[in-house]
Design a protein with these regions (language model features):
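Residue-level signal for inorganic ion chemistry
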Residues: 48, 130, 216, 271, ...
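A hydrophobic, small-residue-rich beta->alpha segment in the mid-to-C-terminal subdomain
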Residues: 337-395
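Alpha-helix C-terminal capping segments
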Residues: 54, 136, 185-195, 218, ...
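Phosphate/diphosphate-binding glycine-rich loops and adjacent basic-rich segments that engage nucleotide
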Residues: 225-290
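General beta-strand structural signal in soluble alpha/beta enzymes
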Residues: 168, 197-200, 224-226, 241-244, ...
Length: 426
């Protein structure tokens, strides 16, 4: 109960630099009781304290902050006092306090912060505080370059000589209001002769939505393949799935911390882009975003990193690669050094625009069955959506002609090639 109360306060206060709301008098009085409570997660307490110190306070919050400074022994766990009374020596807390004060980190400082972050001996409440502080301050482009690079370096990776490898990079916290047919898109790409790698996780905060891992498990597949076995499957069947547990175990081990800090950190932006199987030829990425800030941030980070040859970033449903069938979708492409932005529509590929509503009651079993029905020949919305996303990938990367691609993909479904590629998945 107490943990849930603090999480609810954090959901209100710790949203971000623009969306956070102030706490009222009753809420600040409740917070006084929850911050020192030993029955509440220290990670959640540290994250809440970070939000309180970072964002502009209202009068009730100002009064609480004064109480924290004057009598910290009454209102804070001993571990968190250093946030108010930092030592002079270089430490993770020193860097966190710099972020809390609204100052940006230098490249050297950002790297030092990530040294602490990936050190298993450093307490998770400090890591959560750092993530929250960066979220609320808003990471600079240079900071994000460091964060992306360090997450990339922390991930296990093997190379392949596959000429072109398409990476479907959905957000790891999944979907809980909309469909996502990524596993079927991957199978259809494979049927068309193009290799595709899916990555993800079983479940992670803040949404704990269903993922490609979920769908594969429901389909009787094995989502936890070792990287070498996944590469073998990629070569023989044209598509495969790799789980974060296999390629970035250090981040996978932080799942509980991410649950207790409640809000989405910068980890979510970059963990999906680490490409654990990497082609020595061409690597093409498709990923999605939700918030407008990340539209530009994602594509520019991909360009600056030089880690992919082409990229497609769409304003997908729930930030995924799944595009709406009932309206235009913003689509940004990267081709070498050239970035272009336009809008795309199902009608661009000869597909009917159909109504699509968010549905909080959606379950992954339904998505799996709809995808299987589509591959069995049923003319349903899933079929059109799978074709739409696959056609767009092939068109925008120059792998197929827009005027011909839809008919080709329809034929691959109708002749059973797509279902064969799906069924052959381990």
């Amino acid at each position: 109960m107490k943990q849930q109360q603090l999480e609810e306060l954090l959901k209100k206060k710790g949203i971000g630099p623009m969306g956070s709301k102030s706490l009222n008098q009753d809420e600040t009085e409740l917070l006084k009781k929850l911050l020192p409570d030993p029955d509440v997660s220290l990670t959640t307490q540290a994250t809440m304290l970070t939000a309180l110190l970072t964002l502009t306070p209202n009068p009730y919050e100002e009064h609480l902050i004064r109480d924290l400074h004057s009598t910290p022994e009454l209102f804070l766990p001993s571990e968190l006092k250093e946030f108010l009374f930092p030592s002079a020596e270089k430490s993770f807390v020193q860097l966190i306090n710099k972020v809390i004060s609204g100052q940006n980190l230098s490249i050297e400082e950002a790297n030092r912060a990530m040294d602490y972050f990936f050190d298993p001996a450093v307490p998770e409440y400090l890591k959560a505080s750092f993530l929250e502080g960066e979220r609320l301050k808003r990471e600079t482009f240079e900071e994000n370059q460091v964060f992306f690079s360090r997450i990339w370096d922390a991930s296990l990776r093997i190379q392949t000589d596959i000429p072109v490898l398409i990476h479907l990079c959905d957000s790891f916290d999944g979907s809980n209001r909309t469909r996502n047919y990524s596993v079927f898109v991957a199978a259809l790409l494979a049927a068309a002769g193009f290799h595709c790698l899916l990555t993800g996780i079983d479940s992670v905060a803040p949404k704990f939505g269903y993922t490609s891992h979920t769908i594969l498990q429901l389909a009787g597949k094995t989502p936890l393949l070792q990287t070498t076995k996944a590469l073998d499957e990629l070569k023989t069947n044209g598509w495969t799935y790799l789980d974060q547990k296999e390629f970035t175990p250090s981040l996978y081990a932080m799942k509980q911390m991410r649950k207790e800090m409640v809000k989405r950190p910068f980890l979510a932006t970059f963990e999906k882009l680490v490409l654990p199987i990497y082609s020595t030829g061409q690597n093409y990425i498709m990923t999605g975003y939700t918030h407008p800030h990340y539209k530009e941030e994602l594509i520019k980070q991909l360009k600056a990193s030089g880690r992919c040859d082409k990229a497609i970033v769409v304003k997908g449903m729930e930030g995924s690669t799944h595009m709406a069938m009932h309206r235009d979708t913003i689509c940004i492409t990267l081709d070498g050094h050239t970035i272009k932005e336009n809008v795309v529509s199902p009608s661009d590929y000869g597909l009917h625009i159909t109504e699509e509503k968010q549905d909080k009651s959606i379950v992954p079993e339904v998505c799996l069955q709809e995808g299987l029905d589509a591959f069995e020949g049923k003319d349903n919305d899933a079929r059109r959506n799978i074709i739409y996303q696959t056609a767009l990938i092939l068109d925008k990367t120059g792998l197929a002609n827009r005027n011909e691609v839809t008919g080709r993909l329809q034929q691959l479904i109708d002749d059973g090639s797509a279902m064969k590629a799906f069924k052959n998945k381990t």
